Amino acid sequence: LVTTNPANNAPLSIIATGVFTAGGVDHPGDKVDTVVFPNGTFKIAHSNGTGTQRFNAKTCLGTIVLNGTYRLSGGTGAYAGISGHGIYRLNILIVAARNAAGKCSQKLPPTAFQQIIRAQGPVSL
């Protein structure tokens, strides 16, 4: 999953490979995401994850790394009967904007944001 939009509910680009290959959109939720591919949909239930957050006040660079688990279910169309589970790793890089005084600001929108989630585990259809 990849996004460059810092909004919490922004759709994410998703590419799946393995048992099937497809590209589509992930609609994130607090505990369950909905994945929409051209031939159907399914749900990804996920843990919040645990990890680290760091911010460098000199460079305005923030990093977040989280590891967690997920489970697939609720498939429709080509994904009816999908099941699977596994682990994920979330990486976020943020470059905070600087305010008029030249200090990093958490109130202004970031100048750059990148989120990448890599997941792996067995899947059955």
Predicted regions and their residues:
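Beta-strand-enriched cores of mature, soluble protein domains
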Residues: 1-125
